[in-house]
Amino acid sequence: RLVGSEMCIRDSHGVFPEETALGQKFVVSAVMYTETRPAGLADDLSASINYGEVSHMITDFLQKNTYKLLEAAVENLAELLLLSLPLLKKITLRIEKPWAPVGLPLKTVAVEITRGWHTAYVAFGSNMGDKKKYLDNAIQGLRDMKEIVVEKVSEYLVTEPYGGVEQDEFLNGALRVRTLLCPEELLDRLHVLEQAADRKRIIHWGPRTLDLDILFYDNEIIDTEVLHVPHIDMENRDFVLKLSLIHISEP
């Protein structure tokens, strides 16, 4: 990892008018997680992250953008760095505001977050209308989202429906993505794509224009009212376990 500590920037972020009008000091620290061994063995800066360039990126971003909250500044800055630096896997970013107008002898206030890339596996399927077009459009929709990188897509497989409802056969598959989204945010994006395909949730196990499910998200186990990871119905989906996941899990 690379560490850059306590870079001072004068800028105009804050809730109160005088903060944005007069400006004040902000202190930024970053811990950047990357593989340092290739650069260390080759003594080659191009194999690592140039922390000088990163320092200028941070300064330019904070001086060109204005936020009321430190939370917003640090979130947007972390996203910029993760999207801009291919070798950056994860970052712990801290922004301090030592001149915060709290009216008390306080040394500093700060917001610190850790954000990074995650690996998720998503199953897709359709058994209504132009099935291939629905799947193609969904995959392109994922590619168009800046927080998602589609790394690998399985072949489309024809599978028989199950669940006791008489309906047409499915076209199914799975894909692997890298994403900056948390599991719930990723689920919301999948639902947006389903809605764009006019998905109707009328009959349980019924026909659908588009079905998108999170199978895995890193090594997390999630059990909430809206999300279950690993997906609770995987054992009934031979196309996922036998073919699609095997294909997209390969390097």
Language-model features: where?
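Extended accessory regions or peripheral subdomains of proteins
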Residues: T119-I139, E147
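Glycine-rich, charged/polar anion/phosphate-binding loops
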Residues: R10-E19, T159-E160
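Histidine-centered catalytic/metal-coordination loop motif
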Residues: E18-L87, T92, R237
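Short, surface-exposed acidic-centric catalytic microdomains
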Residues: R37-G52, N137, L142-C182
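Short, small-residue-biased leader/transition segments that mark boundaries at the very start
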Residues: L2-V3, M7-C8, E250-P251
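Hydrophobic core residues within well-ordered beta-strands of beta-rich domains
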Residues: V3, F26-V28, A120, L171
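Short, low-complexity, polybasic intrinsically disordered segments
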Residues: I95-G116
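Flexible, gly/pro- and Lys/Arg-enriched active-site loops
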Residues: E35-G40, W117-T119, Y162-L171, L181-D188, ...
